[in-house]
Structure formats: structure tokens, C-alpha cells
Amino acid sequence: MNLDLLPLEENITFVEYIWIDGSGQTLRSKTRTYLKAIKSIKDLDWWTYDGSSCLQAITGDSEIWLKPVCMVKDPFRQNCNAFLALCETYIYDQVTPARYNFRFLVNKVMEEAKDQDPWFGIEQEFFFTQKNGGYHPRPYGWPKEGFPEPQGQYYCGVGASNALGRDIMDSAYRAMVYSGL
């Protein structure tokens, strides 16, 4: 049975809250169900999670607050009202940024320099691995033993022997464009 085809009431909205945990490298998320139509980020509430489970707090004082700062369409839940909410994290006082909330600092600098028309860029790279029967996965497309040819032919390459995982990347690219990212 395909559960994506189950009809839902129009006033139900799923919002996937996404944040960076205390490792500074790992994304975490959880879904909140709103019993109302969400039209903009202003309709989203702050929410909490257990920071001790995400390397951002000690067990006795573990509530970390999620502040939605960017909302886009959810490309994974297309048959219902659904959004992704990228979030900043704050400790219990809802003022002090939690560990690895670097967006707070970047936003502060960008606001102070907004009369300067600042620019910055982000490059997203993906690294795929495949199991090779052992405990240590190898990069996708590498031979079972040894190493591939030097990168020259692969960089901005075309063809089945050079652009491995292209279908995965095209799917990710399309999902991001759909979302508005």
C-alpha cells in the first residue's frame, strides 16, 4: 500500500524542523504536525528537542530551542501540505545561541554590513560510499582493490564511466530547485 496516496484534510500541515547538532557536522530533524494551513514562516512556532541526545546540552538542562529561519516546500512529501524549516538553535533562555549555531553569528555580521552589499557563496559537495563486504566502505564507483585513475577525467566529466551517481545528483538537484533552495 502506498501511504502517500492516503487523503489528508487540507488544514493539516507537516513541517520538518532541521538543525545542525552539537558535532557541527550532522543534521538532525523531527516533524511537527500543525492542524492549520501554514502560509509563511511567521506561522511556525519555536519548538524544543533534547540537546543532551544531540551533543548540545547536559542531561539535567537539556532543552534546546529551535527557531525556524527559512521555510521551503518539502520535496519528499509532495502529496500533502508539507515544508522543510531550517532552524537556528538556542539554549533554554531562547536568546543565547546553542553550540554550533553559527548562522546567528553570520546573520549578525551580515546585518551590520548590509549597507556594504556583502556577498558570500556556498558550494555543496556530496560524497557517496558503497559497502564492499568489509567494515570500511569505499567511495562509490571505485574499484574493489586499488584506486581509480587521477581525477582529471572525472572533474566536470560526462559519460557513464566518469559521471557516477549522476541520477542521484540530478534527483537531489531537482528536489532543491522544487523546494526553492
Residue ranges of model-derived segments:
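Glycine-rich, acidic/polar active-site loops that bind/position phosphate-bearing ligands
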Residues: M1-L181
